[in-house]
Structures are given as structure tokens and as C-alpha cells.
Amino acid sequence: MNQYIDFNSTIYPFPPKPAFLSKDEKKHYREKIKRLLKQQDAVMVAHYYTDPEIQALAEETGGCVADSLEMARFGNNHPASTLLVAGVRFMGETAKILNPEKRVLMPTLEAECSLDLGCPEKEFTQFCDDHPDRTVVVYANTSAAVKARADWVVTSSIAVELIDYLDSQGKKIIWAPDRHLGNYVRKQTGADILCWQGACIVHDEFKTQALIRVKGLHPDAAVLVHPESPQAVIDLADAVGSTSQLIKSAQSLPHQKLIVATDKGIFYKMQQACPEKQLFAAPTAGEGASCRSCAHCPWMAMNGLQAIVQGLEQGGGQHEILVEKELREKALVPLNRMLDFAAQLK
């Protein structure tokens, strides 16, 4: 029996948007961030879903813009003593688990993730205990405590390959927390997967009929879909994949127009990869319904320039990620399994 958190009835309060900044104010904060990064031996690690100006700043200062797997690798390999993680809290936790000797700062510790929020440790632990014969695989979008309960951690970029491997070993799987990604992986591999019923507030909003209408306006466009989207949306795709995989698909597909069903923060790097192509955001509303996320994670949007300055200036307290030693050691086991497995795929 599936453990079911009724996501559709769970309305997470969205955080306030960062204050509007003038062009001169943005320039002031960018220059200040550059100075602070140098002074503190810090490097920026930013996710594809952060705002374009944050991604550009990470690139300009020698940092990294990537998906959660590459963010983890970069932070693990970079010599800087401080990591400034521009993303959501589980990404900061992962960085700290992999780099306990480093100081890990975030613009705000209030940058949540609906997948993380929708998979509480207590309920998930009980779910796993109820199915002791299953191998527990959790998505990177989970808390350190949930990772500590898992056998494996996985990102969307290697999800199909990992589950295919475990299935070949005769393993039955508990998958958490994203039900859409879990169902997609089950369909791709045929594995015996029991899904936790979470969802991403951004990808869960993509609508089939609205996407069909946009495709009708651009019949020569390819449709790119992240597998956290509903299956009916995935069924319309010309390419399905993680953020990094979608960027590669944007480059390799012959189409000059691309309709993209993932967080629109990805457009910054995708347009860099194929500047000659037109990108269109897949609709997140339809049939008279308005969108809540409107194809951009509200928590990713909290990573503004002012917040980054505050994080670097204030350091601890509201900005530093701390993970208890025992919890870190438990969560490190499935994370290292993921990194070792991913390394074998290269």
C-alpha cells in the first residue's frame, strides 16, 4: 500500500519575492559579492533554476552552474574553504555532508523544496519500516534525515540507469519522493517500484491541453520535458531528461524552436548552449486555472543578490548549513554510492 500525502490538497505558503533592485544597485551588489568571495576564499555553486543574474555571477567568479549532481561533484572537488550554495536547502545540506571540513553558506536557509517538505522523516521512516524487503532509493531533493534512511540517493540524470541496475540485481524498490519521476522510471525500466506520493510544485503544474495548444501554434517545435512532470505531459515530449540532459537535447535536436517544460531558470544556460534557437516556456495553467509557480520555483527565486551579500557578511546563524556528525555519516553512505555509480557511467 502506498503512503500517500495528498499533494493536491497541500498548499505550501510561498516566500516573498526579493526586493526590486535598480541597475545601479545590482552592479553595486555584484561587485560587493565578488570582493567578499575573494576575501573569504569562497566559491559560488548555483543551480540551473536560480535567476539568470545569479547564474551569470557564479560563472563570472569561477563558480559552477549545474544540476544537483554536478553541484555536488564541483563542491567536493573545488579547493575553496567556503561554498556559497545558491539553490534550496537540501543542496546546501548535500554540500555539507560531502564536505564537512568546509563552511557551507546559503543566501537563506528558508529556501525550501516541495519534494523535501512533502517527505517528512517520521512518516517516511515508518513507510520504509513497513516494507523491509525493499531497497530504499531517494531523490536528491530530500532532507539529510531522509537520505540517512536510504540505501541509495539518486538524481534525475542517473535515475533510469540506477534503477535498471538495481532491478537487474533482483531488488524491489521504494522510491521517494517524486511520484511522477518514480512512475517514469518504472515505465522505462519495468522495475518493481513502490512510490512515495510527492510532487514538485513547478513540474506538477504543467498542463497537457495547454501544451497541445502551444504546440499547435509552433508545430515545428520540439517539446522538452523534465520527468518530474505528469506522465500525460511526458507522453508529448520529443526529449525527456534532467536539466543537464535537456540542455544537451536542446543542442542536438535539429528543431529551431523548443518548447521547454521545466523551470524557466534553465533558459539562461540553454540559450547559451544553442543561441540560434527560439525557446518557449511550456504553460503551467489552463482550462481557466491560474498557475501558482508559473514555471519558476519561488524558493529558488529567494537567492537574490542582497541575500547573497548577507550570507557572506553574516556567515553563521541564518546562513550556515550545519549537519550533526552522526546524521552526516549516515547520509554520506548513500550519497557516496550515488557518486561512485555515476562515475562508472562516465
Curated annotation (Swiss-Prot):
**Annotated signal peptide:** none
- Report the top EC class in one word: transferase
Native organism taxonomy: Bacteria, Pseudomonadati, Pseudomonadota, Gammaproteobacteria, Enterobacterales
Report one GO cellular component.
cytosol
Q: Which cofactor does it need?
A: [4Fe-4S] cluster
Q: What is this protein called?
A: Quinolinate synthase
Binding, [4Fe-4S] cluster = 113, 200, 297
Give the main localization category. cytoplasm
Q: Which GO terms describe its biological process?
A: 'de novo' NAD biosynthetic process from L-aspartate
Role this protein plays? Catalyzes the condensation of iminoaspartate with dihydroxyacetone phosphate to form quinolinate.
Enzyme Commission (EC) number? 2.5.1.72
Keywords annotated in UniProt:
4Fe-4S, Cytoplasm, Iron, Iron-sulfur, Metal-binding, Pyridine nucleotide biosynthesis, Transferase
Can you quote the record's cofactor note?
Answer: Binds 1 [4Fe-4S] cluster per subunit.
Q: Which family does this protein fall into?
A: Belongs to the quinolinate synthase family. Type 1 subfamily.
Entries under Pfam families matching the protein: NadA
Look up the record and name the pathway of this protein.
Cofactor biosynthesis; NAD(+) biosynthesis; quinolinate from iminoaspartate: step 1/1
**GO molecular function, a single term:** quinolinate synthetase A activity
- Where iminosuccinate binds, per the record, is at 47, 68, 139-141, 156, 226-228, 243
PANTHER family, sorted: QUINOLINATE SYNTHASE, CHLOROPLASTIC (PTHR30573:SF0), QUINOLINATE SYNTHETASE A (PTHR30573)
Q: Which reaction does it catalyse?
A: iminosuccinate + dihydroxyacetone phosphate = quinolinate + phosphate + 2 H2O + H(+)
